[in-house]
Curated annotation (Swiss-Prot):
Gene3D superfamilies with a match to the protein in the record: Single helix bin
HAMAP family in UniProt: Ribosomal_bL32
Stored InterPro entries: Ribosomal_bL32 (IPR002677), Ribosomal_bL32_bact (IPR044957), Ribosomal_zn-bd (IPR011332)
Protein name: Large ribosomal subunit protein bL32
Phylogenetic placement of the source organism: Bacteria, Pseudomonadati, Pseudomonadota, Alphaproteobacteria, Sphingomonadales
Organism: Novosphingobium aromaticivorans (strain ATCC 700278 / DSM 12444 / CCUG 56034 / CIP 105152 / NBRC 16084 / F199)
Amino acid sequence: MAVPKRKTSPSRRGMRRSHDALSAEAFHECSNCGELKRPHMLCNACGHYNGREVIAVGL
């Protein structure tokens, strides 16, 4: 079984964990309806992407 030879210092532990933080998800306002949507994604509320209707949403 692998066992550490030396105790890991707090500095080294922190450097290892420096990439583990979670970032907040990005949201942008839809240019057509104003709903919040993920960037580079189709708007779920109105079906528009990049200024044009991609899918018909609603009735």
